[in-house]
Every structure is written in structure tokens, then in C-alpha cells.
Amino acid sequence: MAFPTYSSYEELLAAIDAGDSGRDILNPATKEVVGRADTHTVDDLNTAVAEAREAYQSFSQTTHEERCALLMDAADAINANAEPLAELLSREQGKPLNGPNARFEIGGAEAWTRATASFPLEPEVLVDDDETYSTLTYRPLGVVGAIGPWNWPVMITVWQLAPALRMGNTVVVKPSEYTPLSVKALVHLFQSVFPEGAIQYVSGDREIGAALSKHEDVDKIMFTGSTATGAKIIEASAPTQKRLTLELGGNDAGIVLDDVDPQAIAEDLFWGAFINTGQTCAALKRLYVPESIYDEVCDALTEYAKNVPMGEGLDENNVLGPLQNEAQYNIVVDLVEKAKASGARVLLGGEENPDRTGYFYPTTLIADIDGDNPLVVEEQFGPALPIIKYTDLDEAIAEANKLNVGLGSSVWSADRDRAIEVASKLEAGTTWINKHGTIDPRIPFGGAKSSGYGVEFGVEGLKGLGQPHVITIN
């Protein structure tokens, strides 16, 4: 299958830039213009949905084998353009090229696309006896609206796009208004291998997302973002009874047990919290540590964190970047200032740089903080981690569970059985042991409580993008 191959970031950008008709997209590290994004209207959205619906008539009749082959071609296209994609992503989102950032995200998008094409989905025999034979299969739903965030724009678009296509649906992709160029580049590559009309792209503000959510000819919405926006999507989609998969806010808790070696867990604790500069739904956002090893954990984490370089993304030495936008920067500043005003102890960071150009906020660790402090109970979504001391494990579990969110959680222990026992008491869609946020395309992922519903990834994720169909013979 022929697909475009771009030898440089500049070539890729030229293929997708909206030119004079678009709006400027700024690099959050430098405030320089990266490129110009489309400004689509609701009429443009209606056209995109109509074209997706028309393409669905034939695309839905293709086989799983045919669609899997197309996904493999799309993965090849990502691989062939990996470096230009990574540079565009770094400039637009702000994340560095190196570390678990831009190149990592593009590689993950390729790997997730291949994995989605590899999962078996055979008819399930429900009953097979002398009286009844019953099978369950999944057929396409129709048109899927994919609304993505700005933190992992390419990866999360693949999480939505690849399984929807695998199941025979057509897709209308609507990226965040902050990171439309990276997503447009990804869609451009997918469109080059899939049938015309099967993948549509619309770029715009929240009006476009709202119109997509309530569009009468859209059958399902996949959304990753805030709980507040998720609630609006639920309301908008209700009159047309759309299927929904919602991956919403997390504010994930981690509980350290008293049998760990603080030095041994410091690096994994750090990256569990600060991957993508803390801008990850399933990042570790509040850490509960027993009094008996509290100072040792704080010291080990501080010692590791202070040596992790932050800066402009195209500098190969950096592995932490800026906040992606001014609104998120202001949220982090406000929450850290409230923590400091309450008397909490700053172990690292905690001060704005008056000479900064972009939205850089230093890696910040806050100790001796009350469990009801805003930095603990509100999702900061940035490079600031509160470390809460506990003396009673049951109370720590209760504190971890008391919020109305439950995307991920983690337990840190040298005792496997003890860790599993604690993990079983945590109210979250996923609980990791001695890691945090290590997702896998084979393993279903979704939230509890107000962190959303439905799951992504694996065979279970595919099923969520199909219409169950039972055939019973008596």
C-alpha cells in the first residue's frame, strides 16, 4: 500500500498546514508559531458526518482480515514518518523528543495500531446443548465520533481510531483545539491507506465537540478528557441514546507500604507521577506514605527528581517539558500556592520562574500536607506531587478512596500478597503494584466512579465498538 513519506518535519507540516485561512498554534515552550490549524464550522462537521455515513455503507461490509491489513498499513505509515511526527508533536504539545515523550508517543501509536489489528475476535458460543445453540457476534455500530485531549494527542487518537476502524465503523476525529496539527498529521496518514470517506477530521473549539456529541447521525462517542466535559457529553448525547466510552479525570492515589526500600522505588514513583510533566490522566497525583519511612521516601524521591532535566523539547537532553497551555499552568500555580499558604513543606520546586518564556513550572514535591488540601483533592494535572503521611493503613485506604474519581491507583510493597490485599480494597478501574500508569494494549483500561465508563484496549475494548448480536436456534 502506497502512503506518503516525509523526509522532514517541514515537509509534513506543509502537507497539513491550513495556511492563511487557519489560526495560529503556538509552541508552549517558546510561544513561537508552529503552524496554522483549520477552523471548521458546524456546517463542516455536518458534511464530515454525512460523508462518514456514506462511506460506512461499503466499509462496514469489509472483513476483519481486510480491516486488519489496512491497520497494519497505517502502522507502517506511522513508522515511516516517525521522526517528522515526533518533531511536530514536540513543537505543538511541548513534550521533549526524548524520554517517555514525543518519540515514545509516536512509537506507542504504531505499536497500538498493530496490537489492535492482532486481537482475535471469534464468534462466542453461549449455549450448545440438546435444546439450544446460541452464538454472540459483534457487528459495526455506524459512525463513531472520536474527541481527544491535548496531553497525549496522537496516542489517544489511535486508541479511539484504530479499534473503531477494526470493528467496521467509520470515524469523525475531533482533536483538542490546543493540539490539532499532530492529530491532523496522524489522520492524514490513516486516510492515505483507508477507503475514501472512512476517516473524517474536524478542527475547532468546543462548539464543534458539542455538535458532534449531539449529532443525530453519530452512533457512538469516544472521549478522553475532564469529568466536567464528560458530563456535558452525556447530557448532549442522551436524546439520541448514543453509546459512550468515557475516560475522564483521575487524581490517582498511590499507597506506599512500610516494607519497601525507598531508594528502590524512587525512580518508578517519580515517573509514575511526572511522566509527560504530570499531564497524564492515569498519573500518580497523590502519594500516601507511612510515618515510619516517610522522611526516607521524601529524601529518595527528592534526590532523584532534582536531577531530571526540564526544558525546550527539541533539546535532546531534556525529558520534562512545559505545561501545554496557560490555563493549565495557572491551575498548577494556584494549587501549589494554596499548599504553601497552608503550611505544607516544599521539598523541591514550588516557585515560578519570572524569566520564563513558555509555560514551564518546576518539578515540585510537597510534604507535610493535609489530606483535605486542594492540591490533594483537586486534580493538578502538572508537575506537583503532594506526599501525605499516614500512621494507619486502613485510614490511608479510606483517604485514597474518598474522592469521587477512580481511574488508576497503585500499591508499593515488597510483599506481593500484602500488596494484592491492599489493591483489592482500592476503588479504581486499575490498580498497579510497584508501578503506576503502565498501560498495555492487551489489557482493558477504564475508570470507576466519575472517572468514566466503558473500557478501551484489548478484545473487551473492541467489543465496546461493536453492536452485540445474538443468534439462537431452538
Predicted region positions:
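Residue-level signal for inorganic ion chemistry
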Residues: 31, 67, 89, 168, ...
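ALDH superfamily catalytic-core signature
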Residues: 3, 228-370, 433
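Short loop/turn microsegments at loop-to-beta-strand junctions
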Residues: 20-23, 284, 407
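Rossmann-like NAD(P) dinucleotide-binding subdomain of oxidoreductase/dehydrogenase enzymes
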Residues: 124-264, 390
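Short, well-ordered beta-strand elements within core beta-sheets of diverse protein domains
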Residues: 34-40, 54-61, 146, 254-257, ...
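Conserved C-terminal structural/oligomerization subdomain of aldehyde/semialdehyde dehydrogenase
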Residues: 29-36, 218, 309, 353, ...
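Structural signal for hydrophobic packing residues in well-ordered secondary-structure cores
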Residues: 56, 60, 75-82, 86, ...
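N-terminal Rossmann-like NAD(P)+-binding subdomain of aldehyde/semialdehyde dehydrogenases
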Residues: 1-132
